[in-house]
Amino acid sequence: MSWTEFELLNQKEREEFTRCCAYIMARTYVPRDTPNMTISKEYSFIQSKFPLFDEYLALSGWRIYLDRTLAVIYVRNIEGFNKLRLDKLTTLIIITMRLIFEEKRMDGGTLNAGLITVGELLTKMINEFSLLPKKPNNRELKDSLRILEQHNIIYKMSDNYDDMECKIKILPSIAVAIPNDRCRTVYEKLRAEEEENSDENNDEGSID
């Protein structure tokens, strides 16, 4: 790697480079738009120094990508290490959000149209997509949503996930995290599992 470009950075730019490296490694995804619909300073800086980030991260086995269509920058480990393992509830939530995001895009919405409330999310999961038999407890729900928030899959637009009216913005990074074909495959598998569990519970509760 040539450090010529890095050496040309002033002290403030070097500090910002270090900060942005730590940020994207912790968050995985860097959407262009902030919750206030301004341009993210991390996105702007990484984009402006993209070749430098690309070379630097490659040294430790990472690739950085810039998806201009979705307006998101993200990283992947070359060997497939450091993948985030999601529990069952978080997986159900992110699949539901991915389906909602795609629905809104198909309806002609913009990349920033994926705004829902916690209550609407749960209604979709329970009634429409049949992925949950009932509302999960608040602690598990909040933990799952916080994981997605930490990785810039969603933005929390209101104060508290406990509130069913709390607004959540589904970010375009969800389309990178879960491609459409994979989403459908996982959804069908999860729904089949839920239907099987429901049938087993009904059998256990029946009297011949």
Task: Describe these PLM feature segments.
Residues 45-53, 132-150:
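Short amphipathic alpha-helical interaction segments
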Residues 169-208:
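Short, amphipathic alpha-helical interaction segments positioned at domain boundaries
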Residues 31-40, 110-126:
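Short acidic, hydrophobic short linear motifs in intrinsically disordered regions
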Residues 1-80:
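Eukaryotic partner-binding/assembly regions in large regulatory complexes
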Residues 72-77, 155-181:
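Accessory beta->alpha helical hairpin/"wing" motif in late/C-terminal subdomains of nucleic-acid enzymes
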Residues 45-48, 64-67, 104-107, 117, ...:
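DNA transaction DNA-binding modules
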Residues 59-66, 145, 149-160:
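A short, conserved structural fragment
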Residues 54-114:
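Short basic alpha-helical hairpin corresponding to helix-turn-helix/winged-helix-like nucleic-acid-binding
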